[in-house]
Amino acid sequence: MATGAVLPRLLGAGVRAAPRGRAAQRGRTLGSAAAAAAREPERDSDRSARILSEPLKHSDFFNVKELFSVRSLFNARVHLGHKAGCRHRFMEPYIFGSRLGQDIIDLEQTATHLQLALNFTAHVAFRGGIILFVSRARQFSHLIESTARSCGEYAHTRYFKGGLLTNAPLLLGARVRLPDLIIFLHTLNNVFEPHVAVRDAAKMSIPTVGVVDTNCNPCLITYPVPGNDDSPPAVQLFCQLFQTAVTRAKEKRRQLEALYRLQGAPGPHPANPAAPGAPSPGAQAQLGMGHSP
């Protein structure tokens, strides 16, 4: 009786074990295919994340410090401000002195603030952000629009309607995307009042970069750049610098994407820059990825 009782259990166990083995094998086959398909988007997203984090490891990844010097700012007459009677009280820390009743801007502070503004602009362009150039000076409208067009961004040099940013879903549609950065070449309108977009951008928490003259209020500008916003050489220099920063950042993004794509790896791990997929030292030097002195 013991043998008769054990035999059916063994047979039943054998019958049940065979389908379980086939099902497990089938599950492993399907799971491997699904995992391989799922790894591709994960690898692409991981590559993109590490490409975006690469500039954050360096203080001046895009080498914007070499784009200008204090001498070039002086030659472009960036240091010339307005009459002392038009001085805004919040601009006094950036004024070097006064000569013949005209305020002189401290170019050392201008160089420091301009480097921060260019670096931030390059980072926004590197991450694919929308950059909007804004001005109400009619004599520079063509220059500013040409600058934005040449670097693949946008410009607004006409009348700026109030609420265009704060009430954008109602005025422009529900699917409209606001700019990620607004660059003000002039923070005042035609009648020397603060530009409406400065106030609206502050309300919408949109970062701003602005050239502020001695008669401007720099409080609502995220990255103020003390400088002359009236002389054509100064405005041309600012446009050239921002255009170069944007185009250089976009070119660096294309180079890094091509480099990681050719190497076929998700990119360097932050804790191990020499991991497979990391750019070689020669490639890093060519891309300007080395630490700035």
Curated annotation (Swiss-Prot):
Q: Residues annotated as region Disordered? A: 21-49, 263-293
**Gene Ontology CC annotations of this record:** mitochondrial inner membrane; mitochondrial small ribosomal subunit
Thylakoid among keywords:
no
GO biological process terms, semicolon-separated: mitochondrial ribosome assembly; mitochondrial translation
Q: Bias category Basic and acidic residues: which stretches?
A: 39-49
Name the PROSITE patterns for this protein.
RIBOSOMAL_S2_1 (PS00962)
Q: Low complexity bias located where?
A: 21-38
Q: Where is the composition biased (Pro residues)?
A: 267-279
Which Pfam families has this protein been placed in?
Ribosomal_S2 (PF00318)
Q: Which residues form a coiled coil?
A: none
Question: Which GO terms of the molecular function aspect are on file?
Answer: structural constituent of ribosome
Keyword annotations from UniProtKB, A to Z: Mitochondrion, Ribonucleoprotein, Ribosomal protein
Task: Identify the InterPro entries for this entry.
Answer: Ribosomal_uS2, Ribosomal_uS2_bac/mit/plastid, Ribosomal_uS2_CS, Ribosomal_uS2_flav_dom_sf
Major subcellular location class: mitochondrion
The record ties this protein, via Gene3D superfamilies, to: Glucose-6-phosphate isomerase like protein, domain 1 (3.40.50.10490)
Subunit info here reads:
Component of the mitochondrial ribosome small subunit (28S) which comprises a 12S rRNA and about 30 distinct proteins.
What the protein does comes down to: Required for mitoribosome formation and stability, and mitochondrial translation.
This protein is called what? Small ribosomal subunit protein uS2m
Source organism of this protein record: Bos taurus
Gene name on record? MRPS2
